[in-house]
Design a protein with these regions (language model features):
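An N-terminally focused, membrane-permeabilizing/fusogenic/translocator signature enriched
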Residues: 1-85, 241-250
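Generic N-terminal initiation segments characterized by hydrophobic and/or small/turn-forming residues
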Residues: 2, 6, 51-54, 71, ...
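Alpha-helix boundary/N-cap detector
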Residues: 3, 48, 52, 111-115, ...
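Surface-exposed polar/charged interaction patches
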Residues: 15-18, 43, 60-67, 126-131, ...
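Charged, low-complexity surface segments at secondary-structure and domain boundaries
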Residues: 39-46, 104-109, 126, 212-217
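Amphipathic, membrane-active segments
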Residues: 46, 50-109, 150-208
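Membrane-inserting effector segments that mediate pore formation, membrane fusion
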Residues: 110-160
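Long, compositionally biased interface segments
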Residues: 190-250
Length: 250
């Protein structure tokens, strides 16, 4: 009985050893293994420097150029209106090393959501660059008052609301639509793209307001172009050797 148990344990050990073996086969010119393998001689890549501004990236390129050697080409990738990366060209491992990454701190304004009067006024002043249309919206929203017997007039294209025009006088005012505004949606170093928004006034007991984007995200393309223009200007002020090593894409 003990002899049989010993043989069984030896058989289990043998199966375990067989299972630990890695089998490598070649099929149609491609090499495969029956286990996931991990290389021990992989290249070491640096952790990217993190920032929130384009000027920080510009400072890094100008002042830390020794971190990317002269024989190493670099790419500035404008990923989106809020993210830019500085990375190397493909290395021998067919990988790219990201040296710098910057993420813009942008407006927290919630489009297509209702705001009460005070929150709307604060949100506009904190999250939008000044424009004539912004002043018009602020003026109207700040002077709207509740109607007791009449709802806001709305024909689908324009709205009419009562606003105060003096100490006690009131007048009907046409709500401007669409309005052209510049919310803070990309890096502060570039001009904020202008976009069209539909300005709506709600009538659920107290005045409420919202802005609805009305151009399908066209501003993103403009923002990326402005970021590229800014970075190209930075590079144009550097020596030819540095300019020739860096490509900007976006």
């Amino acid at each position: 009985m003990l002899e049989g148990l010993k043989e069984a344990l030896e058989h289990v050990e043998e199966l375990a050893r067989e299972n630990e073996k890695t089998e490598v086969v070649e099929i149609c010119g491609h090499t495969y293994a029956n286990k996931a393998l991990r290389r021990y001689d992989t290249a070491n890549y640096a952790e990217p420097v993190k920032a929130t501004t384009l000027s920080a990236l510009a400072d890094y390129i100008v002042n830390c150029r020794e971190e990317f050697t002269e024989d190493r080409r670099m790419i500035i990738h404008v990923v989106s209106p809020t993210k830019v990366r500085l990375m190397s060209a493909l290395d021998g491992e067919r990988k790219r090393e990201v040296l710098f990454e910057t993420d813009a701190q942008v407006s927290g304004f919630r489009f297509d959501q209702w705001y009460d009067q005070e929150s709307f006024m604060i949100g506009l002043q904190a999250n939008f660059a000044k424009t004539a249309d912004l002043d018009a919206v602020l003026l109207l929203a700040g002077n709207i008052e509740r109607k007791n017997e009449q709802t806001y007039s709305d024909d689908g294209c324009t709205q009419v609301a009562t606003m105060t025009v003096g100490v006690a006088a009131k007048a009907d005012a046409i709500v401007p639509n669409p309005v052209q505004l510049r919310p803070y949606r990309t890096f502060q170093e570039v001009e904020q793209p202008v976009s069209q928004f539909v300005f709506r006034i709600g009538d659920r007991g107290t005045p409420e307001f919202k802005l609805v984007e009305a151009e399908g995200g066209i501003w993103k393309t403009e923002a990326v172009r402005k970021i590229k223009d800014y970075l190209e200007l930075v590079l144009s002020e550097q020596d030819m050797a540095l300019r020739n090593r860096i490509t900007i894409i976006g």
